[in-house]
Amino acid sequence: MTQTTDPIADDPRFPWEPPLAGTELEHLLGMLNRLRWTFRWKASGLDAEGLNKRLGPSELTLGGLLKHLASVEALKFTWEAFRTDPGEPWRSADWSSGDDWVFASAADDSPDQLYALYDESVTNARRVIDKAIADGGIDQLTEMGDDQGNHASLRRVVCDVIEEYGRHTGHADLLRENVDGLVGEDPPEGWRP
């Protein structure tokens, strides 16, 4: 990511803040980063009971969302964008039922496993994005496309992941409030996973 001298984005107390006046790329990656931090905060510090708690008739859980967003990070920025190996557990997963297994299987994973899987997926995705931008920029075409041979730009892939986070960070707000009453838009000053 391009370096900035923005007093907000460069404040180590608030690493999730996007720049106030950055480039398009800085804003795009800054928003993705902010959503990642906010989601991780909403899902943080819970035991298995908290990660598996549901709200109303929904089958969504914070544990399921952790594993789902880990899969989004891993698959969008490896296999879908560049046809590179996403690693385990994604490589050997049974995708015949779509991604339902991701949500359902999260209940079998420990909190430590879920947090590690998510954190590793985000770290790897950041590396892939940084390298791809250095090699070809945000406008480069990826392998993701439609059935007519049109390919999506890396910008489109990043926007798809932002959309996914927007949807599920909203779910995480409600699920976390239902677990222990935690509310808020941003992590508290100095928070780290």
Show where each model-derived region lies.
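Conserved FAD/dinucleotide-binding core of flavoprotein oxidoreductases
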Residues: 21
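Short, contiguous alpha-helical
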Residues: 2-17, 25-100, 142-193
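Acidic/histidine-rich alpha-helical segments that form the ligand environment
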Residues: 98-140, 153-166
